[in-house]
Regions:
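Short, glycine-/Ser/Thr-/acidic-enriched flexible segments
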Residues: 69-70, 138, 169, 176
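Active-site-adjacent "lid/gating" segments in soluble enzymes
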Residues: 1-62, 66
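Conserved PLP cofactor-binding pocket of PLP-dependent enzymes
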Residues: 124-145
């Protein structure tokens, strides 16, 4: 838009899903390009920040992103395991990252005592970044998904009415309709 205002010409914007996926691999790409190290699969775990991954609770899973020492201290206080923060194996991020398997067991032992929603509420009070991991039903029915218009209605002459994922790109002057036009035959 700035370029159009400056030059009077518009432009084509190309955003590919592949490019977006590669962009999110910034840490792995940096490690490969700087150290020629090919990262191994780690699940949801961050390679150098701990704890920063999914943990099992009593009923499901929670993502916790205690990305610095202050957040880890708050997390230990919420979980009522402040002594863990005093242990040299876990007292700073570098030590926690080296001992993450042991730390994960300690955290999951405590997290298994309550359901995810209870932990999320407690952690959010202390501004600890966290959130539930939704199954597809929970994700689709989440009020935030509805408010972002990410499930929309469409029509196809053979299939009839159906729903599909909405457009993740939101633009202030483009009306993001809750209903898409008729789907063409291919």
């Amino acid at each position: 838009l700035y370029d159009r205002q400056k030059t009077g010409k518009g432009m084509y914007i190309d955003v590919s899903m592949l490019d977006c996926q590669i962009a999110i691999l910034e840490n792995a790409i940096a490690r490969y390009l700087s150290k020629n190290e090919i990262p191994k699969p780690m699940g949801s775990r961050h390679p150098s920040i701990a704890p920063f991954e999914a943990f099992k609770t009593k009923d499901s899973y929670i993502i916790i992103a205690a990305g610095n020492d202050k957040l880890f201290e708050k997390l230990c206080n919420v979980l009522k395991i402040s002594e863990v923060n005093q242990n040299p194996k876990f007292s700073n991020n570098s030590s926690r990252a080296k001992n993450m398997d042991e730390l994960k067991k300690i955290l999951e032992d405590k997290l298994s005592t309550k359901i995810t929603d209870e932990w999320v509420k407690e952690m959010e009070k202390d501004k600890i970044p966290c959130g539930p991991i939704f199954n597809i039903k929970e994700a689709v029915e989440n009020p935030q998904i509805e408010s972002r218009n990410m499930i929309v209605k469409a029509f196809h002459k053979v299939v009839g009415d159906f729903k599909l994922a909405g457009n993740p790109i939101k633009m202030s002057t483009y009306k993001d309709e809750k209903t898409r036009g008729d789907i063409p035959d291919l």
